[in-house]
Amino acid sequence: MLIIDNITILRQTIKQWRKSIQSIALIPTMGNLHDGHMTIVNQGRSHTNIVIVSIFVNPMQFDREEDLFLYPRTLQSDYEKLHKIGVDAVFVPSVETMYRDNINCHTFLDVPNLSSILEGIYRPNHFRGVATIISKLFNLVQPNVVYFGEKDFQQLVLIRQMVRDMNYDIEIIAVPTVRANDGLALSSRNSYLTPEQRKIAPKLYQVMQTLVTNLCSGEKNIDVLLNKAAKQLSKFGFTPEILEIRDAITLQPITINSKKVVVLFSAWLGKARLIDNTQVSIPKE
């Protein structure tokens, strides 16, 4: 497994690979890898010739310096996991490599209709940072296919639109959310939970599933469903932030033409901000 931190070497390596292989997969990450990441990497390993994993804690997508500083960094452990699974290369650039000048003066990419709604309300510059770094990685690696987890659903929808808008010849493949046995979506930020909070955390998924059950049973009043879910989460000790039901393709409010919707939850539990989602096909009358 190659460990590459230099753009020139990355490009030279990919140029050599392109002479003899058909497909290159990219899996962008911020490190602190868990079983959810490994599931995504395995998908790439099973379906492409070359798998490149990027590990970069991107300062442009953090709104608070404290969060950037505290984000878990476990490079050696990450390398061991990726080597064991058969990854071909890990790209681990420094901030100076990816943003040669002052980051505040750097060119950025924005997807305005998606970056300012839902998560974007609470994290104003987050998706600008995501779109910019993913675009840079696309340009550097020039992959045939890129894998993203469905847990960060708004990010997935945004990247798909960015690919369409910027005419990238790249296939985006979504990998279903990986969960612990009790239903909690795996996340690097779960490490912020205390042992007691970790016992409570699965309630987020349970409350969401109750809402989904009622929705599929024909409940039409979405406000009633969301208000009930918010009260349940508050009762368990969460501070709800986003409780929404949106069109799964556009993330806009659902209409009679929406074929599939997505239930989106985010809530604070102590110092951990937990997010989750479930896609639902609405039964037609």
Curated annotation (Swiss-Prot):
Source species, domain of life: Bacteria
Cellular component per GO, a single term: cytosol
Pathway assignment: Cofactor biosynthesis; (R)-pantothenate biosynthesis; (R)-pantothenate from (R)-pantoate and beta-alanine: step 1/1
Subcellular localization(s) per the UniProt record: Cytoplasm
Binding site for (R)-pantoate: 61, 155
Biological process annotations from GO: pantothenate biosynthetic process
Main location: cytoplasm
Top EC group: ligase
UniProt miscellaneous comment: The reaction proceeds by a bi uni uni bi ping pong mechanism.
Protein name, per record: Pantothenate synthetase
